[in-house]
Design a protein with these regions (language model features):
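Hydrophobic, helix-forming membrane-interacting segments
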Residues: 1-38
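Solvent-exposed alpha-helical segments and adjacent loops
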Residues: 33-280
Length: 280
């Protein structure tokens, strides 16, 4: 047994020495290649929007929309069961998005960072931090406040619902014409901007016209899987350069399966300071 351990230790030491020598030779004879590779690795980390959102923060703060189902009916019984206020049924796209955001923080930072989640209308002092607002203006008071005040120039959500951005209209599609007809595509929105309640911090708004679009927006923000790499890089460059920007995302839907999001449009906008009131 001792000889086996000695053999493994010897070969591990040899591998370490050889690796160090090869790395040194590569840097000596191919410095431009090494520097370029290191630069790309660092640049990929710096361009990660999540990293930019977490600057100066010990937690990722998430304000979720207040659309919940406070009760449900047990199978075989007509009596409703009331849910605790902190154990709601959430729209599945929002719930999946929250899980992905938490997972991304854990993957990136481990135990060095935490995730704090609360309802938007009970967010307390969370709005003083850089934070994520998860949900659209129909159900999320913070997002409604931002859009009602015209802080995102050229952008609006109209009845339908329809996203209107600089004259372009983006809408979901259905397999049918009735209100309950299933979705075949949905639109997600990413808004990256200065936090209007504390302009030294950032606000990231993620929502969809319907719940699948919310999940698609989170997916695109985290760059888990995006069909258009060129626009994804453009979005990341705008975030890295400190510019406020909007990204419009589209995804396909089959039953409850949400497809790979495609970024349809990315643009920057100029934030205009306006007198702020306490967060809603």
């Amino acid at each position: 047994m001792g000889s086996v351990n000695g053999y493994l230790a010897t070969h591990a030491a040899i591998a370490l020495v050889v690796g160090t020598v090869l790395a040194g030779l590569a840097e000596l004879f191919f410095p431009r290649f090494v520097n370029r590779t290191v630069h790309r690795i660092r640049r990929g980390f710096i361009l990660d929007p999540l990293v930019n959102l977490m600057k100066g923060e010990t937690s990722l703060h998430i304000a979720v929309a207040t659309t919940t189902h406070p009760a449900f009916h047990r199978l075989g019984s007509g009596d409703p069961i009331t849910l605790p206020e902190n154990a709601p049924f959430l729209p599945f796209g929002q719930a999946m998005g929250m899980a992905d955001l938490r997972g991304a923080v854990n993957d990136r930072y481990g135990k060095k960072r935490s995730v704090e989640i609360d309802y938007a209308d009970r967010f307390g002092l969370g709005w003083k931090h850089s934070f994520v607002a998860l949900g659209g203006p129909y159900v999320h008071p913070i997002v409604k406040d931002v859009l009602d005040r015209g802080l995102v120039q050229g952008f609006a959500v109209e009845d339908g619902p329809v996203v209107k951005d600089e004259g372009e209209r983006f809408h979901a599609s259905r397999d049918g014409t009735t209100p309950e007809s299933p979705l075949t595509t949905d639109i997600g929105v990413i808004i990256w901007m200065r936090n209007p309640y504390n302009e030294s911090r950032k606000l990231c708004i993620l929502f969809g016209l319907w719940p699948p679009g919310t999940f698609a927006a989170v997916d695109a923000f985290l760059n888990r899987s995006v069909a258009d790499a060129k626009l994804q890089r453009k979005f990341r460059r705008l975030v890295r350069s400190g510019q406020d920007c909007v990204a419009i995302v589209e995804t396909s839907i089959s039953a409850l399966t949400i497809g790979v999001p495609t970024i349809r449009k990315v643009r920057s906008f100029t934030y205009q300071h306006r007198p702020t009131s306490p967060a809603p």
